[in-house]
Amino acid sequence: IPHKDCATDASSNFSSDALCAVLPQFTWLPKHVFPQKRSYLMKTTIIGFPRVGSLRELKFASEKYFRGEISAEELQNTAKELQSTHWQLQQKNGISLIPVNDFSFYDNMLDTAVLLNAVPERYRALSLSPLDTYFAMARGYQGEHGDVKAFAMKKWFNTNYHYMVPEIEDTTEIRLAGEKPFAEYAEAKALGVPAKLVLIGPFTFLKLARFTGEKTLSDFVEDTVKAYCDYLAKLNELGAAWAELDEPYLVKDLSAEDIALFTQIYKTVLVAKGNVKVLLQTYFGDVRDCYSEITALDFDGIGLDFTEGKQTMALVQKNGFPKEKILFAGVVNGKNIWRNSYEKTLKILEQLRPVCGDIVLNTSCSL
């Protein structure tokens, strides 16, 4: 449980002290919360960690690269150093499952598009390096290789963040094409990091993408499902323990067709999970439209938002929660830097105790 005496200076940059304030030193639960156990150390995780660095190292290194002042290798080295620092900071502060692949040079939706080979032809035609093609999609490109605009940007749900909108053309071949999550997992594993691989889920990716030709979302479902099955197969090969698939689109108002699509996708994807435990992670609200469908599927863990999800507690208490699944309870507000309320967290856990088995303490969204 986040320790009630852990405080921070709100004016400071995001650092070890700030992490201590948001999801800090964890302690033993009071006996009355889980009386059947003499003591119970809750496992903890976060959905994602800020990537820019406490001194904005990523921002400055990226700007130097764009100006031609450092090489691609130097930029990549800065990224690796930041990731290593952030992983070790989380370990130091008692996080049990540490997100990997939450880092991005620009945007996680853009990363997912590249991973799934959704790179429009106008960017391929530039014949740039993979890194520069990525940045051309993010920022546009004007130079000797051509002149193209960047992807459009849209508001990321109810936050001030804006994501890059993937473009899927009629000729796009959705398939597992990138290596980023697997390379980062290997780096984390080498450092002894208890990793949880994080990726935008197939349902949210397809719902937020823009289809630029005659084909529609339904034309790409089969290939997208195959790509995610291949992703899980690769994680099995690497020996990964957990895969987090983020599906924030589930908190929106869903139609019957949306729910059917989500169910169709995951009935197939989850067959491929093998020995990898799959966490369905939601955030920015509750899943009132699809709670029964979510809990009926073969997920090993389900992440629910108890901070912004107005009906989340009622959904769990009214409908129950599968005892064979782990609840990743989003009780720590990921949107601010204030210390977590120890008493409020205990109250939520006491309410969940009669209906839930294993619980992992989680943030409500990425930090």
Segments from the language model and where they lie:
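Serine residues within intrinsically disordered or low-complexity segments
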Residues: 11-16, 39
